[in-house]
Design a protein with these regions (language model features):
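Secondary-structure edge/capping motif, primarily at the C-terminal ends of alpha-helices
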Residues: 60, 64, 96-99
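Residues in soluble alpha-helical coiled-coils and helical-bundle/repeat scaffolds
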Residues: 36-40, 62, 66, 83-87, ...
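Helical hydrophobic small-molecule/effector-binding pocket
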Residues: 69-93, 98-106
């Protein structure tokens, strides 16, 4: 959790094992001894994050024989719980920019593909429904990751999120804009 938080807020390049150790309440030596390297720790944090996303979608309560609409609503509720943890949102977004990295690129591709497989094959969304669900999620992640509401962008952030989230938009925006602890 500590590594996801620090990597999410600062990215791979900006995060340090010292900051992660402070966040976890352990020594930097312990972090290095446990994980070996920052790259290994980032890989573990990536796996943890993708596991959390997959598990959230797998465990979304969907009644037997549910319609596509009911499935999408349950998955949407699970997604809203995920974005409440800004660290996981930012961690996945940073991973999606690292496609060319020799270690993190394959992790990001497999993570994204595994989420798609959960939506399609385990939760039963049609290909177009899964693609639209992911596209909407990526746009929401982008608005939140950019902190679009800061400065002159608040109206645009509110408009975009209202379109994407309906009645949950202001709640998500308020939670995302809440002050974060300094790392």
């Amino acid at each position: 959790e500590a590594a996801v938080h620090v990597f999410g807020e600062h990215g791979y390049a900006g995060a340090t094992t010292d900051a992660i150790a402070r966040e976890a309440g352990v020594s930097q030596a312990y972090v290095v001894r446990t994980f070996g390297s920052k790259e290994s720790l980032y890989s573990e944090a990536a796996a943890y994050t993708f596991d959390a996303v997959r598990e959230a979608f797998r465990s979304a309560p969907v009644p037997p024989g549910a319609s596509s609409e009911q499935i999408r609503c349950a998955l949407g509720d699970a997604y809203l719980e995920l974005v409440a943890d800004r660290s996981k949102l930012l961690m996945t977004m940073s991973l999606y920019t690292m496609g060319a990295h020799p270690v993190f690129g394959p992790l990001a591709r497999e993570g994204f593909d595994s989420i798609y497989r959960v939506l399609r094959h385990e939760r039963g969304l049609a290909a177009d429904e899964a693609a639209l669900f992911l596209a909407r999620g990526m746009l929401i992640n982008t608005v939140l990751g950019l902190r679009l509401w800061e400065g002159e962008g608040r109206e645009n952030a509110s408009e975009l999120l209202s379109f994407l989230l309906d009645e949950d938009a202001e709640h998500v925006l308020a939670a995302a804009a809440a002050p974060r602890p300094e790392l």
